[in-house]
Amino acid sequence: MSEIWEDAIKSNAWPFVEAKKILDSLNGKTPEKGYLLFETGYGPSGLPHIGTFGENARIVMVQKAFEQLSDIPTKLICFSDDMDGLRKVPSNIPHPEMVAGYMDMPLTSIPDPFGECESYGHYMNAKLRSFLDKFGFKYEFYSSTNCYKAGMFDEMLIRVLEQYDKIMELMLPTFREERKATYSPFMPVCLKTGKVLQVPIEKWDAKVGTVTYKDEAGNYIEVPVTGGHCKLQWKPDFGMRWAALKVDYEMYGKDHLANARLYSEICRILGGKPPVQLCYELFLDENGEKISKSKGNSISVDDWLKYAPVESMALFMYQNPTRAKRLFFDVIPKNVDEYITFNQKYHLEEDRAKRFANPVYHIHHGNVPKIETFGITYVLLLNLTSVCNPSDKTVLWGFISKYEPKATPNTSPYLDHLAEFAIRYYNDFIKAHKSYLAPSEKHNVILRDILDMLSDISDQTEAEGIQKAIYDIGMRAGYENLRDYFKDLYQILLGQSEGPRLGTFIKLYGVQETKKLVAGKLTMLSRKK
């Protein structure tokens, strides 16, 4: 075994932990199909969203971790449930009244309300593929409609008929009495209307491969379960798909957890081996409520990318996937700065085991770009933006260049992008909510001390020296908790309750500019009198 393998197999980073579970499940054997299959699922009734990005980003992290542990080839498929019948018309599509006329029709049988593709399902699938391609995911796309109609699932559908009683024994206890009376794992596709029917099955015949149901007129209709003439209910469909495609690894949201046992058991009943599974927690809004597209309390991928680099979003997805996390705009700056910190630590670290434990290793699949921000963080740029209210990033670069002459938009493109992001974020989320604290007599003494201190130093003074001087002034000011001291300074100078290390901020903003800022607050106090 190589040293790289030894470090990877011992790693506690969750993608490696998941990869080890997969390796253990194989018992040292390559799957008969010759490769390891990872699967993600997509419900194409709506557009791809940040959860779609999260699931695909996470599963690829596990896939790449597995490739460090084994030379077994891997493949990722993205499976679209586009044969599902339409149950609800999304609120954010054109011509909803037209789409409403196709309730219960397979998504690939509904005209495209956007007028671009052959069906609504095809449009959403195209959006998914474009979305995944944009972020560089390597995958094979599978359409439920194509799989059913092309006969890819035929063998398993006959097996569902053969194991009909066992599957019903498993499923029926999970329903209320009235649903028990009508439930069947098969949903015939009506030859007349094209609708996916949820009707009782009167008769099933595994030898000829058919089911029989009553239509609205009371006529008995016999249809084959193969060739796309029937669709399985979603819970049996999940387990059947695992068995048919021989899926080795799948992750899903907590909303699937209660049914995961059913998926696995149906897979076993059909002669398959359930995949290794990871259940990830769902996102919450800033109030701790479950995010819902219909409520509009979520962040879209485009929203995030308006204010921050994609790596920060990938870091958010990497962190603690099995723990519920709040997803709202306030988390963006924190994740940007954490990404910068992890990136810098990665490139300073020579210990490979510690590199494997660093999130950026998994975000970039081992090929971690080196970024240089010269100690300037996203939050620091937001605070700089707060005091100089720039119309464009050239104003920020004026301060950055004085702080670090080596930094230019060309030599530091990452920092250049952060400057753009910071201005957008400030204008949209901070500017309207700034609330300045009017300085009191006590604050007046503090501000004069700070002004005197700034008069005794130059732009060459190091940030740590400035920080210590600010700290010493606070110690003399009589605060029981210095956190309150810094909070007061942030509210007086920046109009917000939190802020950066003031030594670094003053170094970036400039001593003379900071003197003007402080003097302006003293002028406010004089006017108040």
Swiss-Prot record:
PROSITE patterns: AA_TRNA_LIGASE_I. Pfam families: tRNA-synt_1f. Keywords: Aminoacyl-tRNA synthetase, ATP-binding, Cytoplasm, Ligase, Nucleotide-binding, Protein biosynthesis. It is found in: Cytoplasm. Its main location: cytoplasm. GO terms for cellular component: cytoplasm. It catalyses: tRNA(Lys) + L-lysine + ATP = L-lysyl-tRNA(Lys) + AMP + diphosphate. A motif ('HIGH' region) lies at residues 44-52. ATP binds at residue 293. The keyword ATP-binding applies. One of its GO terms (molecular function) is tRNA binding. GO terms for biological process: lysyl-tRNA aminoacylation. Belongs to the class-I aminoacyl-tRNA synthetase family. PANTHER family: LYSINE--TRNA LIGASE (PTHR37940:SF1). This is Lysine--tRNA ligase. It comes from Rickettsia akari (strain Hartford).
